[in-house]
Amino acid sequence: MKIIFMGTPEFAVPALTKLINSNHKVVAAFTQPPKAKGRGLSETKSPIHQLADEAQIPVYTPTTLRNEEAANLINNIDADIIVVIAYGFIIPQNILDAKKYGCLNIHPSDLPRHRGAAPLQRTIIEGDKTSSVCIMQMDAGLDTGDILMKEDFDLPKKITLQELHDKCANLGAELLIKTLANIDKIVPKPQSNEGVTYTHKLTKEEGRVNWQDSAFSINCKVRGMNPWPGVYFKYNDKTIKILEAEYSDEEHNFTPGTIINKNLEIACGKGILMIKKLQQEGKKVLNIEEFLRGFKTPVINKVQ
């Protein structure tokens, strides 16, 4: 099968790698234009751009697909299907319909739960116990297309965002190959109208701890928002970012936000948050033992 691949970040790399090493032929790769990075502001190609270059796949970097030029470009590429994974641009209907098998997408959540821009982060932030990877036939809606293949899995209690990212990227790549091999036999399954949720992009403001929340909820945020935007609190007008934590459901009578002992354990609306790794603004990352050597605070103090 001849494939146009559309993707940009590391999440899309396992799928393109699988396709390159399969009996299919990737005839073109579309990705976000190179971006200026670093002190010298040199242009850096996306991970998909770099991989496609290595595999000698023609690469296209339009700034939009919503014009006649992009439509003509895609129409003139001889392909059977378009695979879209974290591309970063909306795909207009004329391109969704441009090829025989339309456009397929890998979505890392249990659709229709966590449609939208941040499914991986929200899966962890919401404390989900299970998740899925779906191969979806794209339509004009936001992650509303029929499901062609799906695999469910349990989530370890301490799973990090990077671990979930890697698992879904690799599992999605495997499911994509299986889907392409059986595409003429698969009966598309419409998504349920129940249990629909949408995820928006994270903001820096969401990372600030609300100590009225449960310790469980705050710990989920720590795992789901690392590295960005990061979960943080204020102490003596300084920002401290929590990079790793554990929690206890132990009952207490402290006001939420109270530092209850010299190990920097903090009372929450329910339970206690035990910080294990953190970073003070302008300082390097420290584990809790290293941090406490230079951190003097009386017990029964408040953070914000």
Swiss-Prot record:
Annotated EC: 2.1.2.9
Keywords, ordered alphabetically: Protein biosynthesis, Transferase
Binding residues annotated for (6S)-5,6,7,8-tetrahydrofolate, in chain numbering: 109-112
Domain of life according to the entry: Bacteria
UniProt catalytic activity: L-methionyl-tRNA(fMet) + (6R)-10-formyltetrahydrofolate = N-formyl-L-methionyl-tRNA(fMet) + (6S)-5,6,7,8-tetrahydrofolate + H(+)
InterPro entries the record matches: Fmt, Formyl_trans_C, Formyl_transf_N, Formyl_transf_N_sf, Formyl_transferase-like_C_sf, Met-tRNA-FMT_C, Met-tRNA-FMT_N
GO CC annotation terms, alphabetical: cytosol
GO molecular function: methionyl-tRNA formyltransferase activity
Disulfide bond positions: none
Coiled-coil regions listed in the entry: none
Keyword Transferase: yes
Family as reported in the entry's similarity comment: Belongs to the Fmt family.
Function per UniProt: Attaches a formyl group to the free amino group of methionyl-tRNA(fMet). The formyl group appears to play a dual role in the initiator identity of N-formylmethionyl-tRNA by promoting its recognition by IF2 and preventing the misappropriation of this tRNA by the elongation apparatus.
Protein name, UniProt field: Methionyl-tRNA formyltransferase
Phylogenetic classification of the source organism: Bacteria, Pseudomonadati, Pseudomonadota, Alphaproteobacteria, Rickettsiales
